[in-house]
Regions:
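N-terminal single-pass transmembrane signal-anchor helix
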Residues: 2-33
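Short amphipathic alpha-helical/adjacent loop interface patches that line ligand
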Residues: 5, 48, 52-55
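Conserved catalytic core of two-component sensor histidine kinases
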Residues: 18, 45, 52
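Aliphatic-rich helix starts adjacent to a transmembrane/signal segment
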Residues: 31-49, 62
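Periplasmic/extracellular, small/polar-rich flexible segments of pilin-like filament-forming proteins
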Residues: 56-138
Length: 138
């Protein structure tokens, strides 16, 4: 008597594997996309550092006062004007002793305009914070 030897996977085994892969993908993809978005914040860090250095040069040229310093009259090109820029930048609340630089994510590459990165310079030092997708930035 001959026995039929069947080889391969049953339909049930294939369905179970598909379900497991689907569950793993649903857990991993949101984390992947947030990591990709968070990595785009490095562009803003580099630009904010350049703006900060320009503000310090402006501070010295203005005789120790940040109020005369704005993106329009500084010695660097606005980083938002560079091709492929993902952020727009603003200098808010410039005072005699400090300033605030705000980088707002634009809609390029799937960004949203509600996510911001803020750098605050005071006599105590520099602090960074974020909103929206960048809430964990320090």
């Amino acid at each position: 008597m001959k026995l039929n030897k069947r080889s391969g996977f049953t339909l049930l085994e294939i369905i179970i594997v598909i379900i497991i892969v689907g569950v793993l993908a649903s857990l991993a993809l949101p984390r992947f996309f947030s990591t990709v978005e968070f990595s785009k914040s490095t562009e803003s860090f580099a630009a904010m550092t350049a703006i900060r250095q320009s503000l310090e040069r402006c501070y010295l040229a203005a005789g120790g006062n940040y109020t005369a310093c704005a993106l329009a009259n500084m010695d660097i090109e606005n980083p938002a004007n560079s091709p492929g820029a993902r952020f727009s930048y603003a200098i808010n609340a410039a005072s005699v002793t400090g300033y605030t630089i705000v980088a707002t994510r634009n809609s390029a590459d799937g960004g949203d305009s509600t996510s911001t990165i803020t750098m605050i310079q005071t006599t105590a030092g520099v602090t960074r914070s974020g909103t929206g997708k960048y809430v964990g930035i320090k």
